[in-house]
Structures are given as structure tokens and as C-alpha cells.
Amino acid sequence: MERIARSLLVLFFIVFSCLSAQAVEQPTYKNTVMVPQTVQLGQCVKTFNVNFEKLFFLTETAINSNNYNIEEIQSKGGYIVFSVAQYKFLATVYTFGPGNAILKITPCNNIYTFPPMIITNVYRYIEQNQYKKF
């Protein structure tokens, strides 16, 4: 009986020694969602198959639903100024042929090092809702 208990204790010790060593060896990965990265201008421009007015409203709704702070809106000019943390962006909507419009989201300070998920979240929201009726 004592021999079985000792064997189980040794086995228990070996298993926990291996698990703790394995946990130390695993590298820790940084969350890259909100890490600033250099973004190309091509990633900031996207064409949608909706008209100017609908894309403008979808952009405003996307910014609002992502809890970004809207600082200025001009519907006639087709632009929205919004901020996320310390980053400030200009979202501009352009007409591009019949039934098409372009959305361009650029940083206001013209420094293209920011978390790319900020603009990706806006584009993703618009893509998911562009065919819904208002």
C-alpha cells in the first residue's frame, strides 16, 4: 500500500513538473488588434455598391455603433470627423458612378501609423448592412 502511494506521489510530481516547464516555454503573443501599425493608403479607401446618401448614413451608423466619438459631421460635403483614443480620423464619402460610392478614412494628422482595426471595423459594419433597407 505504501509503495503504491509513493509511486502515485512520484507520478504526480513528474506530471506537474512537466506541465509547469511546458507553460514557461510557450511564447506569449501580443494582442495585435489595437497595436499601431503602418497602414497603406490603399487600405483606407473602399468602394461600395450603394449610393452616396446611403453610404454616408451607413458610415455614420458604423462609427456610432463602434463607440467612436463623432466630433464633426457635414452631410453636404460628405465627411465625418471622429476620434478613437488619441487617434483622429476623417471619413469622406465620394460619388463614383451611378449607384456606387467610395469611402475614404484617413488620419487627420496624416500619420498612417495607427491600429488598422479602427477602419476595418467601420468597413466590416458597412459590408454587413449595405443591403438592408432603411
Q: Residue spans of the language-model regions?
A:
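Ser/Thr-rich, low-complexity intrinsically disordered terminal regions
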Residues: Q22-F134
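Short, intrinsically disordered, low-complexity terminal segments
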Residues: E2, C18-A21
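Bacterial N-terminal signal peptides
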Residues: L8-C18
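Bacterial N-terminal signal peptides that target proteins for export
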Residues: M1-L9
